[in-house]
Structures are given as C-alpha cells and as structure tokens.
C-alpha cells in the first residue's frame, strides 16, 4: 500500500521546463494523484478489511454478507427524520411494511473505487494530450538556458540559436497555442461532466452534498438529518430469501453495518469542496485566456509583468508585430529562460522580426 502511494509522488515533481500553468497542473497532476489515492485507500478498505457485516438468524453470516454486498442494501428515507433510540434503532432503519416504493436502495458502494480510478484517468487525459501535442518543443528551444551552469560562449551560441529559431518560425505557432488552450478548456469540461455524473451516481445527492453539510453543521445531531449519513448510511437493511426444509419460501430480514461508508463520506466531502474550488479556478482561467485572445492591448502588459526587465516599448512592439501563436510562445519562454537572457533575446527579436500585415497597414 505504501509503495503504491509512494509511486504517485512522481506526478507531483517540479518541472524544470514549464509548458502549462498552475491551475492546469492542479487539475492534471494534483487531482489525478488525489483521486488515485482515494481509490487505493477505499480499495484497501474494501478488499483487505470487511466492508459489510450483517446480523441475521438462521443463515451463515458470510452467506448473507456476500449476498447483501453483491445485490444491495436499503433504508427507509422517512425513518431518517425519526428520533434515534425512541422511534428507530438507527437512522433510516425502520419496518418497510412490504412497501417497495418507499425503499431507497444503495448499490454504489461496490463501484466507488473503480469510479474514482476512472475519474483520475479522465483528469490526466488533458495532460496526456498536451504532452503529445507539445512534443518537447519548449525544451528543445530553451536548450538549457533556464539554468546558469554553462560557459559564456555556450550561452551566446544557444541564445543565437534560439533567436534564429524565433525569426525563422514566425507565424507557425498558432496551432501550438490553440491546442494548449483547448486542453485547458477540456479540463473545465471534464470537471463539469464529472460533477454531473457523480450527481447521477449518487441519485442526485452530490451537487448539494457539501452545502447541506455546511447548513446543518450548527444544528444538534438529534434535530437534523445528517447529509453524510443519508448519502452514505452506516447501518442499512437487507432482505435474504431461502427455501425451508419443506420447500417453503423463507424471508430473513438482516441489519447490515457498512464501515466502508465512513471512509466514503469523508472522501466525498473533500472531493466536493475540491471540485468546486477547481471549477471556479478553471472558469477564471478561461475568462483570462479570453482576455488574451480578444483584447490585444492586454498582451503587452502581461508580457511586461512576466519579466520587468523588458521595457514596455519592446513588449508593445512584439505584441503588435506577432500573431497570437508567436506571442504565446514568447510569453511561455519567459517562464523558462534566465531573465537576463530572455531580455536580450526579446530585445533583439523585436528589432529583427518583420511587422505583421495589420501593423504595416497602419
């Protein structure tokens, strides 16, 4: 278990060459590791421990445990509003009086570990696609200029090679930028779709799960319906049928304890809060990208903010002469180059790059 969790550390290592931003990494790396960790913990609890334990007379316990785990257990929703110890033995546990429509069945618990695993894979997909699209371009053109451990002659040679690449490949990076922004947009779509599917998975209880917990946090336990216990009940019921000695059908009503749901309820509280935080960050990021794309006057200020050593005149000149793809490339270069080298390269690049058609028309 510890070895499996330790192997996830590699996904959180600092990147010496950055081709994305912090929010993108939070979605692709941190959330992937978070979901995989939750999946491993629940898997260990489910298959190493005892996920269900049922009380019943006249039937071997392991038979009932296996049956109720494979099929499903249920509660009576109206019993959650009754006082425990007086009206009901446990929250949601009461006589069903043969009313099948009044029962709330729980079938999700055996699938939680698999669902979390596939959620993790879905969160990693944008990073996988971007790595394929990017193809190591940034690392190739940086050529180690992000570190200072090289001779002066070597620095100058690499700087000239970088400048030569930028001049020869003007107007060839629009697809590079579009693919990255598409991957960022995919992150936002992924979170929205996952939240919708989780809400369906938990019968419409996920989207309001965290807010219900916060609303009732100050209400005494005996005066409220605990949302965590309602969505992840710790004690449920299960009906087991078998044939008696004479062939008559016998019904056995069992009380089942689900210790796994204690882990599930805490896991999904954290996931609920994290997904909402991540969704807000991703929406803000998309709005920010929209400002970059549709507000050209915003680009010089952003370029200058990334490296204060570059004069605003040079930032304006580059933003005016370059299309959005080339501008994005030099903006990302600022995160990967030594600031002094970056200033020299951008100053020389601004002198040598030809103005765009729009700029010449002016």
From Swiss-Prot:
In ovary, expressed in follicle cells. Expressed around the periphery of the embryo during cellular blastoderm formation. Repeating epidermal pattern emerges from stage 11, high levels of expression detected along the borders of each segment from stage 13. At stage 13, expressed in the dorsal branch of the tracheal system. During stage 15, detected in a few cells at each of the branch points of the dorsal trunk and at low levels in cardioblasts. In embryos, also expressed in the salivary gland and the hindgut (at protein level). At stage 17, expressed in the dorsal side of the CNS. InterPro entries: Innexin. It holds the Pfam family Innexin. Keywords: Cell junction, Cell membrane, Gap junction, Ion channel, Ion transport, Membrane, Transmembrane, Transmembrane helix, Transport. GO terms for cellular component: basolateral plasma membrane; gap junction; membrane; plasma membrane. One of its GO terms (biological process) is monoatomic ion transmembrane transport. It is found in: Cell membrane; Cell junction, Gap junction; Basolateral cell membrane. Residues 50-110, 199-267 are extracellular. Residues 1-28, 132-177, 289-362 are cytoplasmic. It is a multi-pass membrane protein. Disulfide bonds: none annotated. The chain crosses the membrane at residues 29-49, 111-131, 178-198, 268-288. One of its GO terms (molecular function) is gap junction channel activity. Structural component of the gap junctions. Essential for generation and/or maintenance of postembryonic neuroblasts and normal development of optic lobe. Belongs to the pannexin family. Heterooligomer of Inx2 and ogre. This is Innexin inx1.
